[in-house]
């Protein structure tokens, strides 16, 4: 019984190798017998080689499974000529993956002007401490010019707008104003309580910006992604009273810098400007507290 089973198994192997007793064995046929069975038609064989990129995880246009033997199934329709690489077939079976909209170019002219304004801030502080008010007034005029050009370019050229710029512009203003107010307070040109109020508000706003950046960052949150200027997650919208407050603060700085040059440091109008600046600073802080989420626009893919 055992011998009969062995004989049947040997006959099956010989038959699969395409030769039987009494025929001349072929080494080529014996080798092909060890390979997987060949598809039932040449169309299936060609389709199997055509689908190899899909097995490797690649997404190529117009590749779909077909069965030439049964005739079932049809290839996915190819895109029309001239549709471009941005078009995509149903199901996302072709075309390159789209670039995330969160990435943007940070090297715009307004952003460079904001960085210039940040760089001028310590220079102005040094000139004020050294009581070189004539040069300080000229450098401050240059910093103010960069602020005006920054906003003008961003409003009139859409390709110069960026989410980074919406945060970098007010950040540059706050750094410039904070250094100027500390320096002018050191020079006894601005009272200490007013400087304390302005810096406290700016510190809270900067902390809020960092918090919003963390909260709007998609998971996994990494330091490289957090500090990547090209990866924008939110766009900030300052309130109207905040814009007015920034203008009033800069006017007070200009008036204080010019006071020792034109000898009106004890003017009553300068003191009225101190009080008005304190009022707009408090109103600006309250506006951010009141509107909160309305000042932040989250950017999504």
Curated annotation (Swiss-Prot):
**Annotated protein name in UniProt:** Cardiolipin synthase (CMP-forming)
The EC code for this enzyme is: 2.7.8.41
Cofactor(s) required, per the database record? a divalent metal cation
Source species, domain of life = Eukaryota
Q: Kindly list the places in or outside the cell where this protein is found, as annotated in its UniProt entry.
A: Mitochondrion inner membrane
Give the membrane topology. Answer: Multi-pass membrane protein
Give a GO biological-process term.
cardiolipin biosynthetic process
Q: Name one GO cellular component term.
A: mitochondrial inner membrane
Instruction: Provide the family line.
Output: Belongs to the CDP-alcohol phosphatidyltransferase class-I family.
Activity's sensitivity to pH is recorded as: Optimum pH is 8.2.
Q: Where is the composition biased (Low complexity)?
A: 71-93
- General function of this protein: Catalyzes the synthesis of cardiolipin (CL) (diphosphatidylglycerol) by specifically transferring a phosphatidyl group from CDP-diacylglycerol to phosphatidylglycerol (PG). CL is a key phospholipid in mitochondrial membranes and plays important roles in maintaining the functional integrity and dynamics of mitochondria under both optimal and stress conditions.
Where does the record place the region Disordered?
70-93
> What tissues has this protein been observed in?
Highly expressed in tissues such as heart, skeletal muscle and liver.
**UniProt key word Transferase:** yes
Q: Which disease is it linked to?
A: Combined oxidative phosphorylation deficiency 57: An autosomal recessive mitochondrial disease characterized by multisystemic features including encephalopathy, neurodevelopmental regression, ocular anomalies, decreased vision, auditory neuropathy, sensorineural hearing loss, and cardiac defects. Disease severity is variable, ranging from premature death in infancy to permanent disability in young adulthood.
Enumerate the UniProt keywords alphabetically: Disease variant, Lipid biosynthesis, Lipid metabolism, Membrane, Mitochondrion, Mitochondrion inner membrane, Phospholipid biosynthesis, Phospholipid metabolism, Primary mitochondrial disease, Transferase, Transmembrane, Transmembrane helix
The transmembrane segments are 109-129, 133-153, 190-212, 250-270, 272-292
Q: Which organism is it from?
A: Homo sapiens
Gene of origin? CRLS1
Q: Which InterPro entries match?
A: CDP-alcohol_PTase-I, CDP-OH_P_trans, CDP-OH_PTrfase_TM_dom
Q: What GO MF annotations does this protein's record show?
A: 1-acylglycerol-3-phosphate O-acyltransferase activity; 2-acylglycerol-3-phosphate O-acyltransferase activity; cardiolipin synthase (CMP-forming)
Under catalytic activity, the entry for this protein gives: a CDP-1,2-diacyl-sn-glycerol + a 1,2-diacyl-sn-glycero-3-phospho-(1'-sn-glycerol) = a cardiolipin + CMP + H(+)
């Amino acid at each position: 019984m055992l011998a009969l089973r062995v004989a049947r198994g040997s006959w099956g192997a010989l038959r699969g190798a395409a030769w039987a007793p009494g025929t001349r064995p072929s080494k080529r046929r014996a080798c092909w017998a060890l390979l997987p069975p060949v598809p039932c038609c040449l169309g299936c064989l060609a389709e199997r080689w055509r689908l190899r990129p899909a097995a490797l995880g690649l997404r190529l246009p117009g590749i779909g499974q077909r069965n030439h033997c049964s005739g079932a199934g049809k290839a996915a329709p190819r895109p029309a000529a001239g549709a471009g690489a941005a078009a995509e077939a149903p199901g996302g079976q072709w075309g390159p993956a789209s670039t995330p909209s969160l990435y943007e170019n940070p090297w715009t002219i307004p952003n460079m002007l904001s960085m210039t304004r940040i760089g001028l801030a310590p220079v102005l502080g040094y000139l004020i401490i050294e009581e070189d008010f004539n040069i300080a007034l000229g450098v401050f005029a240059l910093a103010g010019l960069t602020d005006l050009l920054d906003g003008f370019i961003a409003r009139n050229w859409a390709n110069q707008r960026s989410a980074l710029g919406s945060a970098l512009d007010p950040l540059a203003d706050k750094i410039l104003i904070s250094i100027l107010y500390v320096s002018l307070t050191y020079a006894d040109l601005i009272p200490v309580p007013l400087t304390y109020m302005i810096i406290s508000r700016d510190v809270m706003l900067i902390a809020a910006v960092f918090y919003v950046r963390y909260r709007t960052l998609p998971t996994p949150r990494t330091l490289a992604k957090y500090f990547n200027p090209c990866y924008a997650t939110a766009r900030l919208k300052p309130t109207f009273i905040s814009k007015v407050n920034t203008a009033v603060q800069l006017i007070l700085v200009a008036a204080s810098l010019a006071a020792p040059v034109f000898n009106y440091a004890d003017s009553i109008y300068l003191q009225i400007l101190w009080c008005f600046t304190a009022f707009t600073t408090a109103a600006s802080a309250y506006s951010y507290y009141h509107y909160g989420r309305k000042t932040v626009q989250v950017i999504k893919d």
